[in-house]
Every structure is written in structure tokens, then in C-alpha cells.
């Protein structure tokens, strides 16, 4: 199986996740997003500063690093970096939904984006492990 298409899809999804998380973080920090502070009732946050920084640095940063690794980094780390970024996105959305509830469809959509990142990373790893070896046969996986 050719992994080029999977790699391209993974880069696109990672870049989308990175850019949208970073833009969302900036929007929260500078007040462009019209989200009332009452949304934070019952959370440990008095304002959106800490959530915005976490969103931009941790969620957006991990997706950006995963995209950069997939584009320019060592191929052996691209699936791992993307899966980690996807897990961070899924975890972020799960915690957000648990803390403030499922208020808008965007929360569910980004949860799915995280799952897509994980799925594409797994597919890329599978494709790489099933490329024909020197003998023309797929690499064998041994349990022992």
C-alpha cells in the first residue's frame, strides 16, 4: 500500500488542527470570541487565559509539531507524533465537554478530528509496515 496519500492527509489534518487551535487560542486571549465567562462556571478557571494558553501551546503546538515531523522530520516518528497529537486533541475535547458540557457542534467535530488524526497515524504505520521488503514480501510481524 502506498503511504504518500495517507501522509498527505495526515499533514493536512494536523495543520488544520494546529491552525484552528492556535487561532482559537488567540481569539480567546484577545477577546475576539464572544464566549461569556459564565461558561467557566464550575471550572478551576476565572478567565480564559489559562485555557487559551493550553489550547494554543499544547493542542495547537502538538499538532504543528506532528505536521512538521510528517513533512520534514524522520519518517520513523511521523505516525507516533500524529497519534500523540490526536490523543491530546481527543483528551482536550473530552475534558472540555466534561467541564462545560457539549454546548456547540464544534466540540464534537474537534473530538472527531482527534480521532481522525489517530486513525490516519495508525493507517500510516500499517502502510509502512506492509510495504514490500527486499524479497518483495510484506514484512513479517513476530510475536516471539
Give the residues covered by each predicted segment:
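Topology signature of small-to-medium multi-pass alpha-helical membrane proteins
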Residues: 1-144
Amino acid at each position: 500500500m502506498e503511504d504518500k496519500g495517507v501522509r498527505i492527509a495526515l499533514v493536512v489534518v494536523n495543520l488544520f488542527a494546529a491552525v484552528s487551535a492556535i487561532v482559537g487560542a488567540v481569539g480567546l486571549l484577545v477577546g475576539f470570541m464572544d464566549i461569556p465567562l459564565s461558561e467557566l462556571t464550575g471550572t478551576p478557571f476565572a478567565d480564559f487565559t489559562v485555557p487559551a494558553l493550553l489550547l494554543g501551546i499544547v493542542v495547537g503546538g502538538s499538532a504543528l509539531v506532528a505536521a512538521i515531523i510528517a513533512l520534514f522530520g524522520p519518517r520513523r516518528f511521523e505516525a507516533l507524533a500524529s497519534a500523540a497529537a490526536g490523543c491530546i486533541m481527543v483528551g482536550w475535547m473530552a475534558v472540555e465537554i466534561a467541564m462545560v458540557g457539549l454546548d456547540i457542534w464544534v466540540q464534537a467535530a474537534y473530538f472527531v478530528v482527534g480521532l481522525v488524526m489517530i486513525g490516519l497515524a495508525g493507517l500510516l504505520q500499517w502502510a509502512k509496515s506492509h510495504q514490500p521488503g527486499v524479497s518483495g514480501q510484506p514484512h513479517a510481524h513476530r510475536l516471539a
